[in-house]
Regions:
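Short, solvent-exposed secondary-structure boundary/capping segments
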Residues: 31-39
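Short coil-to-beta transition motif at edge beta-strands of beta-rich domains
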Residues: 1-15
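Ordered hydrophobic segments in well-structured contexts
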Residues: 10-12, 21-23, 35, 59-60
Length: 131
């Protein structure tokens, strides 16, 4: 992390569990956060309860939306990094971030199902008397 950011600088920053490209609109080097205007979504926020990750059986399963185009959010300074690549168009970046999450979760489901199948087969092999 650099401690010499300037207003107007383009950065990559994290807010809760999402990652964004944005423009610094307010910077206080003595503070703990910078006001960043969202320009693109790099990673969509994770769904569910942050205190119990990967657990669907919680009392409240949070639906987390990405920050909106041009929304200004206070982002922790330790998450800021200089960004020098092309800035994706907001809607296209949101669509891609959402697609990537859906694909990763779908692969995870398929992998888990295959693992369970193999573990059940091994269980029958290890303990045939219990099958």
């Amino acid at each position: 992390m650099s401690d010499t950011y300037q207003v107007g600088e383009i950065v990559q920053a994290e807010y809760k569990t999402g990652k964004y490209v944005g423009k610094i609109v307010e910077w206080n080097p003595n503070g703990s956060k910078a006001a960043v205007q969202v320009l693109a979504v790099l990673n969509h926020p994770m769904q569910g309860n942050l205190h119990h990750p990967m657990n669907p059986d919680v009392s409240y399963f949070h639906q987390r939306r990405a920050l909106a185009n041009q929304e200004i959010a206070l982002m922790p300074l330790e998450t800021l990094q200089a960004y020098s690549g092309p800035i994706p168009e907001y809607e296209a970046s949101l669509k891609e971030a959402l697609r990537a999450d859906i694909e990763a979760l779908t692969k995870s489901i398929r992998f888990s199902e295959k693992c369970l199948s193999e573990l059940h087969a091994l269980q029958k092999e290890y303990f045939p008397e219990q099958a």
